[in-house]
Curated annotation (Swiss-Prot):
<dbReference type="GO" id="GO:0031640">
    <property type="term" value="P:killing of cells of another organism"/>
</dbReference>
<dbReference type="GO" id="GO:0005576">
    <property type="term" value="C:extracellular region"/>
</dbReference>
<keyword id="KW-0204">Cytolysis</keyword>
<keyword id="KW-0027">Amidation</keyword>
<comment type="function">
    <text>Antimicrobial peptide, active against the Gram-positive bacterium S.aureus, and the Gram-negative bacteria E.coli and P.aeruginosa. Has hemolytic activity (5% hemolysis at 128 ug/ml).</text>
</comment>
<keyword id="KW-0044">Antibiotic</keyword>
<keyword id="KW-0929">Antimicrobial</keyword>
<protein>
    <recommendedName>
        <fullName>Dermaseptin-4</fullName>
    </recommendedName>
</protein>
<dbReference type="GO" id="GO:0042742">
    <property type="term" value="P:defense response to bacterium"/>
</dbReference>
<keyword id="KW-0354">Hemolysis</keyword>
<keyword id="KW-0878">Amphibian defense peptide</keyword>
<comment type="similarity">
    <text>Belongs to the frog skin active peptide (FSAP) family. Dermaseptin subfamily.</text>
</comment>
<feature type="modified residue" description="Glutamine amide">
    <location>
        <position position="23"/>
    </location>
</feature>
<keyword id="KW-0964">Secreted</keyword>
Length: 23
């Protein structure tokens, strides 16, 4: 379960950076 949380957090961070670049 821990690795799922890590992947989830990494995915959120990546999406946040992508959104910032787009905007």
């Amino acid at each position: 379960a821990l690795w799922k949380d890590i992947l989830k957090n990494a995915g959120k961070a990546a999406l946040n950076e992508i959104n910032q670049i787009v905007q």
